[in-house]
Amino acid sequence: MNTRPTAHKFSIERKQVLAADYLLSLPPGYGADTTKRWPLILFLHGAGERGTNLNIVAKHGPTKIEAAKNNFIIVSPQCPDGKIWSNDLLLALLDDIEKRYAVDTKRVYLTGLSMGGFGTWNLGLSHPERFAAIAPVCGGGQTIQITLAQYFDAATMANYKRMGIWAFHGGKDTTVTPDESEHMVGALKKAGCTDVKLTIYPEAQHDSWTKTYANPELFTWFLEHTR
């Protein structure tokens, strides 16, 4: 009997249905000038807002903030109960929104809190070519993504260095500890990324998103970045 390993191939085609409910906020004046393209924010909520009630998606995040509502198209999808954010779903939704609305595809921004902060790190680092800047709030990610890009994927690494990254965390967060953000930001800086920064609120616990989204500087910073 031959015990040497032999080469084989495997292939299977599966149909995938991607569906999501989402809130859409259009800025005042949208549509008045049919040639104008608008910047877009994709917002990912936390674990507590999962389900089928879209009203709770608006509980936190940029849809409550005038500086965001007045200047951006804001897309806020809802993650189903028991699930986490899917990159395939979010990219398909983003593709659809960009086709149906007057989106400036060079000014697409990504942010999210807690579970959505993890989703922001994951989607932003997996597809940096889609975003001008990202702002993960009280999240974390896999530094191995950065290491692999640094040594094996020059194109992705170039996109990391181009993309603005501003992370936020509460210094007293025990739900997602601040070292999660510190590790990600540290790995990016070590890899040569310069447009990356971290804001720690020393006295904040898990809710670091209220201060973050209430600060108009975040939305000004977004608009300073283009892809």
Q: For each of these PLM feature ranges, what is it?
A:
Residues 28-36, 82-115, 128-130:
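Gly/Ser-rich "nucleophile elbow"/oxyanion-hole loop immediately N-terminal to the catalytic nucleophile
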